[in-house]
Amino acid sequence: MATKESKYERVEKVNVDADGATLVKNIGEDRGKEDPGMNFQDKRPANLVPGAPAGVIPNRIESLPTDRAGQRLREHLSESERLRVSRSSTSSKSSSFVEPSLKYRGEIGPIGKNGEFVASSNRQNSSSNVSSSDNSERASPASRNSNPGMNNGMTTQRTTVITESSVQGLGAQRTVPIQPHQQREDHEVITHESHARAPETTVVTIPTTRFESAQLESRRDGRTYTEDKELTIPAPVVAPQIHAHQQVNMSGGTSATIHATTDLHLASEAQINDMGPEEYERYRAKVEALARIHEDETSRKAAAYRNAVEADAELIRQTLERQHMRDIEFRKDLVESSVDRQQQEIRLEAEYAMRALEQERVNARAALDQAMASTNIDVNIDSAIGTTHSQGRVTTTSESRTSQARGPATAAVI
């Protein structure tokens, strides 16, 4: 059996119900590890009753000499009260015993504050004055152990303390034994396993619905005409008339004006008389024939010139019409090439953005895989039985390795 200064072999938990009954539960066994939650030492004062904490009546204590136990009991007696102490010891090797009954006598107050207890048993009686210190009383696990195998056949001593006082109690009140103070530290290592992801190929597909309808209608209307002008051919002047106008200024403020007109006749009257009117008619016919010949030749030349001008005008018009069609085709080709260029730019931008996002994802995953994360946890709970402190720290460290293998390049003929 464990001694006072050695590690306890079992750790127990005490639950107290509304009626004050205690229920002892076994938490675990000490297997020799350095666990502060299970390997705690008894820190009770040396002047207390062996095997029991302050303010709690022990029901099982270790075997001690009778005079030493009596000396420790006499140290707790009050000088102002007269008490009768009766002590009886019983040696037994059996683990069965009768639980003592507790009664409280004294003033009504908080639990465990200056109270007096009366314990009675069917086997032995004694008296002592025991006063609890505060609400931080601790019950020894060895004193509450009801496992008969823990005695190992050793001699035990049972002491029942009966306290009598002149103060009359107004009611029954029981001291609730609480679990001894424990400091527990939990160390938990969580291993996160990440399975290798299958290689995946992301194909960005953009659904495109294209409606194309081409209908070209070309209509050409042309008209070429020439406005003819009248050709005036003047007759040749052989001898024009002579007109003279002269003004003469004379002295004395007088002036004189002279008008003279001279008509020239090429043929003399004698010659006219000699040629006769028939000759004159022949002359006039020849002159008219020459005029008609000249007019016909001029008209023919004008028609040829007009035809050449009209042909050139038609050629210029047709050239301009072809230029119109070429302009339309050029504009259509310019629009198509501009749209194709913008599509290629958008495709390149999308590819670059996807690569950038993939790189960001790889960097973020690598940073998280190789990073160390820690969290400090501090819990403080104030309750009726005291203040509970719980502190912890969670640290996560991960490391990952990624390998990439590239196969031979393959070319597909489209």
Curated annotation (Swiss-Prot):
Segment CAHS motif 1: which positions? 305-323
Provide the protein's localization: Cytoplasm
Q: Where is this region: CAHS motif 2?
A: 342-360
Skewed-composition ranges (Polar residues): 142-155, 388-405
Residue ranges under compositional bias (Low complexity)?
86-101, 120-134
The chain's coiled-coil residues are: 341-376
| Major place of residence | cytoplasm
Region Disordered: start and end of each range? 27-155, 388-414
Function (record text) = CAHS proteins are cytosolic heat soluble proteins that seem to contribute to the anhydrobiosis in tardigrades, but their specific mechanisms are yet to be identified. It is possible that protection during anhydrobiosis might occur via the stabilization of vitrifying small molecules such as sugars, but not via the direct glass transition of CAHS proteins themselves.
Q: What is known of its domains?
A: CAHS proteins contain 2 repeats of 19-mer peptides designated as CAHS-motifs that comprise each two octapeptides connected by a tripeptide.
* Miscellaneous comment as given in the Swiss-Prot or TrEMBL entry: Trehalose, a disaccharide essential for several organisms to survive drying, is detected at low levels or not at all in some tardigrade species, indicating that tardigrades possess potentially novel mechanisms for surviving desiccation involving tardigrade-specific intrinsically disordered proteins (TDPs).
Would you tell me the protein name for this molecule? Answer: Cytosolic-abundant heat soluble protein 89226
Species this protein is from: Hypsibius exemplaris (Freshwater tardigrade)
Organism phylogeny:
Eukaryota, Metazoa, Ecdysozoa, Tardigrada, Eutardigrada
